[in-house]
Curated annotation (Swiss-Prot):
EC number in record: 2.7.13.3
Listed name of the protein: Sensor-type histidine kinase PrrB
Domain Histidine kinase: 237-446
Residue ranges constituting the HAMP domain according to the UniProt record: 172-222
Gene name, Swiss-Prot/TrEMBL: prrB
Cellular location(s): Cell membrane
Record field: transmembrane: 19-39, 151-171
GO cellular component: plasma membrane
């Protein structure tokens, strides 16, 4: 009982459904045709019996004028019963006398046997009635035999349709089985999932939908891995880079707590604590921005007006550094698809590096657009960067020989990250103003 309940509880397979649907679809016309043939056979056998009775009656009518005793047995139909009535006289060629029925054809029962009777009236020379009858036994036997053949043919047709559907369904469901096997083989490995199915249009559409879904899952999984790696990197780097300034802060605080310092010494120690705290805050802020940049996706990219972005950066830099002269080289409107906040961060960091580490008093911003993309240049008149250090300074926590010790070492790393996120590069050159030129190249979308 449990096995049957499990069998019926399971949803039929697609192959089984195709077979059942085909069998039902084939059974409907087969049953209609079979019913028509069935009724046709029944009527045809009955009509044949009626013609048999007509032949027997036509054979007997010529003998009626000779007398009732002259009526012979039918040579072609030995089992036909012929009964003749003339007045009160009744004559039959068998020991069975057929009853007098209405003209034409009629059914009757004699001795428990069903008979088909054909009655013919002869008006002259004397009113005479001839009744010719035969049993249904042979007709019923022949009809049943033909009916059995019809049933066998119909059953064979339905079974053949089901078998044919079963064979065709094997080819129809093959793409779906391949899809199921490929889907089962998908795991969290190092390669992107591939679902390739050829065959039925429906299977191809499902495969495309599955491929898209798996790709989205894969992308989200990669983003999760990247986020986890970024979090681990953030924790490791933070621990490494913050340990030294935190130790210095602790030492200074212990000095303030344990020693009775003069006012000028006390102010100097407090200044060191404040500077160390600012350095820690700047480092944490830069690390946070690096982590945010690593988690950005192509969905975050929007149209950006580079000319307007540089104009705002120039105005803000003037307010942040009152002694700095910032100029913007006029250029046509340049719009690209990118990360507005990230590009602004890169420009701001380039300006801040020029002021803090290069001692620049003048900064010039410019942008040039071409088919290859956009090139943003930040020129300054500061001390510049030695040629052998122009690649190293883009690494995290790397400082040039001319850099001050107050920075986090992440400013140019943020610039390089933004260049990479936009499919471009970041580099340092010698500026026409005498200092350094930072070039941020952004590739055009393909």
């Amino acid at each position: 009982m449990n096995i049957l309940s499990r069998i019926f509880a399971r949803t039929p397979s697609l192959r089984t459904r195709v077979v059942v649907a085909t069998a039902i679809g084939a059974a409907i016309p087969v049953l209609i045709v079979g019913t028509v043939v069935w009724v046709g056979i029944t009527n045809d056998r009955k009509e044949r019996l009626d013609r048999k009775l007509d032949e027997a009656a036509g054979f007997a009518i010529p003998f009626v004028p000779r007398g009732l005793d002259e009526i012979p047995r039918s040579p072609n139909d030995q089992d036909a019963i012929i009964t003749v009535r003339r007045g009160n006289l009744v004559k039959s060629n068998f020991d069975i006398t057929l009853p007098k029925l209405t003209n034409d054809y009629a059914d009757t029962y004699l001795r428990g046997v069903r008979y088909r009777v054909r009655t013919v009236e002869i008006p002259a020379p004397e009113p005479t009635s001839i009744a010719v009858g035969a049993t249904y036994d042979a007709t019923v036997a022949e009809t049943n035999n033909l009916h059995r053949r019809v049933l066998l043919i119909c059953g064979f047709a339905i079974a053949a349709a089901a078998v044919f559907a079963w064979l065709l369904a094997a080819f129809a469901v093959r793409p779906f089985k391949q899809l199921a096997q490929q889907t089962r083989s998908v795991d969290a490995g190092g390669e992107a999932p591939r679902v390739e199915v050829h065959g039925a249009t429906e299977a191809v559409e499902i495969a495309e939908a599955m491929r898209g879904m798996l790709q989205r899952i894969w992308n989200e999984q990669n983003r999760t891995k990247e986020a986890l790696a970024s979090a681990r990197d953030f924790a490791a780097v933070s621990s490494h880079e913050l340990r030294t300034p935190l130790t210095a802060m602790r030492t200074n605080l212990e000095v303030l707590a344990t020693l009775d310092l003069a006012d000028d010494q006390r102010k100097e120690v407090l200044g060191d604590v404040i500077r160390t705290q600012s350095r820690i805050e700047a480092t944490l802020s830069a690390l946070e921005r690096l982590a945010q940049g690593e988690l950005s996706t192509s969905d975050d990219h929007v149209p950006v007006d580079i000319t307007e972005l540089l104009d705002r950066a120039a105005h803000d830099a003037t307010r942040s550094y009152p002694e700095l002269k910032v100029s913007l080289v006029p250029s046509p409107t340049c719009i690209i698809v990118g990360l507005p906040a990230g590009l602004r961060l890169a420009v701001d960091n380039a300006v801040a590096n020029a002021v803090k580490h290069g001692g620049a008093t003048r900064v010039q911003l410019s942008a040039v657009s071409s088919r290859a993309g956009v090139e943003i240049a930040v020129d300054d008149n500061g001390s510049g960067v030695p040629e052998d250090e122009r690649q190293v300074v883009f690494e995290r926590f790397s400082r040039g020989s001319t850099a001050s010790h107050s920075g986090s070492g992440l400013g140019l790393a943020l610039v390089a990250q933004q260049a990479q996120l936009h499919g471009g590069t970041a580099s340092l050159e010698t500026s026409p103003l005498g200092g350094a030129r930072l070039l941020l190249r952004i590739s055009a979308p393909s």
